[in-house]
């Protein structure tokens, strides 16, 4: 039994050197991916993008009125794509909101939620952006909206 365990460890260490990364995260997105993982951990979720094989890119999206996408294609990493034009002009909170929204689709398998509170504000980061609710993602509302993101 002991020799079998040694063979397993030896075999896995050899394979580790040959592994090609299954995911890539654009350096511009890395901070926001890290924040998502930190916020998940605060809420007892473990998010490991390499294990989950999630990639992230900032690219030009040519579809009208689309600023972010989550692509699930069999055999390839799940991919978050953020529109470069939007990204270049967005504030830190707008970037975070969008990345968290797309990771909500890609990691948490969340659908859009377009419900509003009594004041007409969207109650979720997972709003489609085309609903009647108002996106109100500010330092004051951030924590509650992130709580909702992970409480599904």
What are these regions (language model features)?
Residues 9-13:
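C-terminal motif of bacterial Sec signal peptides marking the signal peptidase cleavage site
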Residues 96-110:
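Active-site recognition of the HExxH zinc-binding catalytic motif
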